[in-house]
Amino acid sequence: MSEQRKESLQNNPNLSKKDIKIVEKILSKNDIKAAEMKERYLKEGLYVLNFMSSPGSGKTTMLENLADFKDFKFCVVEGDLQTNRDADRLRKKGVSAHQITTGEACHLEASMIEGAFDLLKDEGALEKSDFLIIENVGNLVCPSSYNLGAAMNIVLLSVPEGDDKVLKYPTMFMCADAVIISKADMIEVFNFRVSQVKEDMQKLKPEAPIFLMSSKDPKSLEDFKNFLLEKKRENYQSTHSF
């Protein structure tokens, strides 16, 4: 667990000392499992991406469209509180996907990924894939606290959410190895200021690239796909400390 995370917990007025110790224990246990999973990803030759965002930002639609590229082979772990709908959508596109329903939990944990990983391996999905994509539970808060051992953490911000979210949810955007502004075809409708997002990211994490993406603009997705392929070739590994 990072020093920043410890300090944040200790300064939380809603947590007692006992609560802080419990949370620290949970996060430390998750970090250990995340490190174990990272070793397993590398052993399988998988480049793992952790996609995080609010609900409805377009994560699943983006994955459906990525499935159309023949040079981008991937399988998926889906996280939602309830239903198998997102995994079912991806299976219809020919993507091997395992759904994790978390009940009331607003995030995925490394131990949850382990179970899904084993099932995908048993199905033979891992050996057919270059990437394992984790579509985290839709939430701009909780997932940013849990390391999943991914090579890259990618945050989507959809235009209808507004251009002020980066500094409102700094812990999430500090995780980002890349940021996608999704539903970019609606920028004018919502008076969305891309410049505001760029300015805020410069303050928070200037090295993270920002992509404008729209399902109506196939090239925007292709550019992002090529970026991911290049990062895999480089074997880029996130240095973010959860």
Curated annotation (Swiss-Prot):
One of its GO terms (biological process) is protein maturation. It holds the Pfam family cobW. The keyword Glycoprotein does not apply. Ni(2+) binds at C106, H107, C142. Zn(2+) binds at C106, C142. The keyword GTP-binding applies. CDD domains: HypB (cd05390). One of its GO terms (molecular function) is GTPase activity. Residues 48-211 are annotated as: G-domain. Keywords: GTP-binding, Hydrolase, Metal-binding, Nickel, Nucleotide-binding, Zinc. It comes from the Bacteria. Involved in the maturation of [NiFe] hydrogenases. Required for nickel insertion into the metal center of the hydrogenase. Exhibits a low intrinsic GTPase activity, which is essential for nickel insertion. Belongs to the SIMIBI class G3E GTPase family. HypB/HupM subfamily. This is Hydrogenase/urease maturation factor HypB. It comes from Helicobacter pylori (strain J99 / ATCC 700824). The lineage of its organism: Bacteria, Pseudomonadati, Campylobacterota, Epsilonproteobacteria, Campylobacterales. The gene is hypB.
